Amino acid sequence: MYEGVVQDLIDELGRLPGVGPKGAQRIAFHLLQADPADVRRLADVLLEVKAKVKFCSICFNVSQDDQCRICRDPRRDPSVLCVVEEYKDVVAIERTREFRGRYHVLGGAISPIDGVGPEQLRIRELMVRLADGTITEVILATDPNLEGEATATYLTRMLKPLELRVTRLASGLPVGGDLEYADEVTLGRAFAGRRSADD
């Protein structure tokens, strides 16, 4: 244990995802030894991100504007909608350059053990988007784990009465994995080989 604000800094850094106690300590000591101007820039950027970044009013991707660049892009196919769990999944799919439609970010996955049901996700907003008839295909690009599969199954049942083409990403993604960690080739192949969600 360190004194006062040093320990406070280590504790706060340790709350970040993927940063353990030793990593938090290394980052804290790096910041203590860094040039004050560099630390100020980091602090300013953190505050600026919290102040300026919000969620797109259409798809719920991160954006500095009311609508994200993907929703504003007239070259994107408005008839195909890719449903993902988190905004970081949008980045992973965009890296493949295989998908030219639009997105809908649910904000998580159904996980009863964590107290997350359909009501906590942006499923209501998804149904509103589908109501105008512009979208003809929905790609369910949830993580290939238990929660992702539960979410995809739930959505498939919800979407069936709408008579849309509902597809899932093809295999090739490891079960139990997260989309954001898939390499571009694997994710690209999974996109190209997607299948009907009813199969």
Curated annotation (Swiss-Prot):
The keyword Magnesium does not apply. Keywords: DNA damage, DNA recombination, DNA repair, Metal-binding, Zinc, Zinc-finger. GO terms for molecular function: DNA binding; zinc ion binding. It holds the Pfam family RecR_ZnF. CDD domains: TOPRIM_recR. A zinc finger (C4-type) spans 56-71. InterPro entries: DNA_Rcmb_RecR, Rcmb_RecR, Rcmb_RecR_Znf, TOPRIM_dom, TOPRIM_RecR. The keyword Metal-binding applies. Residues 79-174 form the Toprim domain. GO terms for biological process: DNA recombination; DNA repair. Coiled coil: none annotated. May play a role in DNA repair. It seems to be involved in an RecBC-independent recombinational process of DNA repair. It may act with RecF and RecO. Belongs to the RecR family. HAMAP family: RecR. PANTHER family: RECOMBINATION PROTEIN RECR. This is Recombination protein RecR. It comes from Nocardioides sp. (strain ATCC BAA-499 / JS614).
